[in-house]
């Protein structure tokens, strides 16, 4: 099964603990699926900066044998970073620097690749809504992760048109 994490990826940074790690909902889901579904053929379609955090994302994916051929590396760009805090045992998103994800759009070649996947994961953390119809035009199934964005203006449109979605309330 071909599966791609498409769109927003980032590095979670816990400054007070001196810990950082590559993540994003699609990356997390993909890594977990890789542990559960041995036949999964994983890939990621996203953008990173040419900074240390971007290198960390690439290394984490390559270590897990994820196809990174559709990761756009933006020269001089800042990889998306989410500064995290711990409140007891709960993680709290403190501050987000979306960096290169703000203007990110997949290339034509990226879109061709996306349409060859059996499943993709994506979410509202980037400008994806207008691309969804094209992404599924050749049968790719979309796992759409709304997380806590159940009031986003695009929710009704997406719910009417796509197969798999997830809310975290």
Give the residues covered by each predicted segment.
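Short polar catalytic/cofactor-binding loops
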Residues: 7-12
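Glycine/Thr-rich phosphate-binding loops of Rossmann-like dinucleotide-binding domains
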Residues: 13-14, 130
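Substrate-binding N-lobe of the ribokinase-like
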Residues: 2-3, 15-81, 88
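Ribokinase/PfkB-type carbohydrate-kinase core domain
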Residues: 1-6, 60-73, 85-169
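Generic detector of contiguous secondary-structure segments
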Residues: 14-15, 122
């Amino acid at each position: 099964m071909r599966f791609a994490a498409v769109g927003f990826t980032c590095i979670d940074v816990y400054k007070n603990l001196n810990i950082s790690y590559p993540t994003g909902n699609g990356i997390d889901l993909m890594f977990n699926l890789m542990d559960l579904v041995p036949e999964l053929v994983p890939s990621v379609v996203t953008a990173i900066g040419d900074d240390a955090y971007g290198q960390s994302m690439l290394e984490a994916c390559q270590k897990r044998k994820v196809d990174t051929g559709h990761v756009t590396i933006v020269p001089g760009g800042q990889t998306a970073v989410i500064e995290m805090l711990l409140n007891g045992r709960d993680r709290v998103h403190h501050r987000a620097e979306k960096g290169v994800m703000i203007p990110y759009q997949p290339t034509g070649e990226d879109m061709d690749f996306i349409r060859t996947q059996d499943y993709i994961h994506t979410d509202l953390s980037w400008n994806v809504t207008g691309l969804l119809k094209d992404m599924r035009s050749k049968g790719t199934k979309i796992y759409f992760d709304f997380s806590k964005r159940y009031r986003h203006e695009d929710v009704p449109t997406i719910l009417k048109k796509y197969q798999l979605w997830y809310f975290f309330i």
